[in-house]
């Protein structure tokens, strides 16, 4: 007999017992599709060992969802091979909200999608058992794929001592680490989404492939909800809205480096202005460091050896330089410009820095994935005893900032990786415990990601949920035990000795471009007044009303409002439609009655009309709406 643990209970089972056999002793075992054994995702068919700790997975768990989608990718490949036996499968990974599989020697169109889906349904109805098997060595594995140069390339690159596994379901088998579902019967709802061209290993010099994207769910209801979400996401696409609202553009001359238009800069400036106010009140000092720094700096920071492939480099006077991909090293140099005392700690230093990173052209996407962006970094220098309290301060800042935009979020604590880390065990334990206690005190829900911290320290990641329930990783709080030592930073302790400070590195927006993209989609282009690129548009009925309109425009601009005037010859109804299409918060129509009575006809972008509003009431209301950072209209 061996003893294992599940749900904090101990179980004695026979040697050779599988996770699936243990699951039969538990409630709702029919929902289990996989298992975490000692925190690693595994098949239900996995044999248990003495001391194992188990957590059974359903399709609602992140790890279970990944297993579900991974198996669905195999179903897609099996269906394609049944329909086009000469196709050559390559790889089929899980991606956000679905999966894809790449094929060589295949040509299909959208008209083939129903045929693929019908074939997948047949495979599901066959309830094929999914089995894992391993190869004794590389030669045995290579013999399994004699006609597939892609699989053989992958096999040859594996380390000599690495276990090589494959999975089979019916006539189909595929090289794969797994884990997978117990059978094909679980995939009740399957959808082919689109196809695209691809290259083997993303290299344009290699073989051309056809990529088929899909998604799947345990029920048709869940699939329908997901497809509705996709349609809603299309309506909210920040790239479409960014062009429609004249906020930003992408130019072929500079891929992945957005061009912000005047209207976009109004939103940008409002974001930065709010960020500065928030950080000034929280005791941060702002700096600005250079874009370009020499190789020596990047060697000290470790970027030259470990990150050079993602950096833009150049030579000046025979010396190597790089455009900064991160703000951190520049802040280290600022810290070293003078001596520091423990009395200054926590020393909070913030920077909105423009950084550049090499990204594959195929990975670029609007404002979400770019090569040039602004990062709102801050570095807090402190003593080990101050870590918990300062982390709590940062978490309160996070709550304030995201609450201002009406964004829900959750936090994830990533702990020490198993290998290739710096710092001794006691320091890691102290740092992780401090972050954990701060999270508990904050009262914000969080989950723990064992082993997913950075090599230089544990971290807290901020995941935002938008209006259509998508999640985005934005900000981060990282305890860095690496850079202060690399740059030989020091401070004077209370005892008069020199010591290396602890450093908390944090970003709240993360990439400001990306955060703006999230806001555009979350608000569907309908920005709250304080963020809006056009808060008020004055619409004249006739030319004789233009002088009064200009008078109001100039007066309101002096109050800090973003006001425009439409005195064109278009009809009033057309002017109103134009303003509504640009998501202007308030439209003011000026005619004879309004001028004679010194009142305003106000129309909201929701098409509510409020007549005979006094100028004083209108201004007082919208200035309150703007200054209070209200997310809803107050008029």
Curated annotation (Swiss-Prot):
**Residue ranges annotated for the TGS domain, each copy included:** 1-58
State any GO BP term from the record: threonyl-tRNA aminoacylation
The catalytic activity of this protein is classed by the Enzyme Commission as 6.1.1.3
Q: Which cofactors, by name? A: Zn(2+)
Cross-referenced InterPro entries: aa-tRNA-synt_IIb (IPR002314), aa-tRNA-synth_II (IPR006195), aa-tRNA-synth_II/BPL/LPL (IPR045864), Anticodon-bd (IPR004154), Anticodon-bd_dom_sf (IPR036621), Mopterin_synth/thiamin_S_b (IPR016155), TGS (IPR004095), Thr-tRNA-ligase_IIa (IPR002320)
The entry's family comment says: Belongs to the class-II aminoacyl-tRNA synthetase family.
Describe the protein's quaternary organization and the partners it interacts with: Homodimer.
Q: What does this protein do?
A: Catalyzes the attachment of threonine to tRNA(Thr) in a two-step reaction: L-threonine is first activated by ATP to form Thr-AMP and then transferred to the acceptor end of tRNA(Thr). Also edits incorrectly charged L-seryl-tRNA(Thr).
- The protein depicted here goes by the name Threonine--tRNA ligase
Chain segments carrying region Catalytic: 237-528
Q: From which source organism is this entry?
A: Chlamydia pneumoniae
Q: Which NCBIfam families match?
A: thrS
Recorded catalytic reaction(s): these are: tRNA(Thr) + L-threonine + ATP = L-threonyl-tRNA(Thr) + AMP + diphosphate + H(+)
In the UniProt record, the gene name given for this protein reads thrS
Q: Which PROSITE patterns match?
A: AA_TRNA_LIGASE_II (PS50862), TGS (PS51880)
**Subcellular location, record wording:** Cytoplasm
Asked whether the UniProt record includes Cytoplasm among its keywords, one would answer yes
Taxonomic lineage of the native organism: Bacteria, Pseudomonadati, Chlamydiota, Chlamydiia, Chlamydiales
